[in-house]
């Protein structure tokens, strides 16, 4: 079995909360494989390419990937070519603002925000 019923339901819940973001992202695709389960596939549209894929292990794993992608959207929007570790105070405020609607629906995963931000210098 790829996931227990409980694990799959938890992953599906996270997927539904992030559904619009998942649909609109040009950086990745979330796919289902009958062989390995959910796969996070890094992609690009300009130029068109498929990069790496990794198996989503849990709801927390999917939530972490989605939150990280939301943060990267903010950094791309500001035109700064750096990682979250170098985000300035305004970027951090915007990242936290964009995370809030998701975390309000998934409060059990709020600790992931702290984990992502703890990578900062």
Segment roles from a protein language model:
Residues 1-5, 97, 117-121:
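Short intrinsically disordered terminal tails
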Residues 21-22, 36, 61, 121:
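Intrinsically disordered, low-complexity serine/threonine-rich segments
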Residues 35-99, 103:
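Acidic, low-complexity, intrinsically disordered interaction modules
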């Amino acid at each position: 079995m790829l996931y227990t019923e409980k694990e799959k339901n938890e992953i599906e819940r996270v997927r539904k909360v992030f559904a619009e973001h998942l649909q609109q992202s040009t950086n990745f695709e979330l796919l289902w494989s009958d062989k390995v389960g959910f796969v996070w596939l890094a992609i690009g549209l300009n130029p068109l390419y498929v990069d790496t894929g990794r198996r989503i292990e849990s709801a927390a794993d999917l939530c972490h990937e989605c939150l990280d992608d939301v943060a990267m959207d903010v950094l791309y929007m500001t035109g700064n070519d750096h990682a979250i570790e170098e985000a300035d105070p305004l970027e951090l405020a915007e990242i936290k603002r964009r995370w809030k609607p998701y975390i309000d629906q998934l409060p059990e995963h709020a600790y992931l925000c702290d984990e992502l931000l703890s990578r900062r210098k």
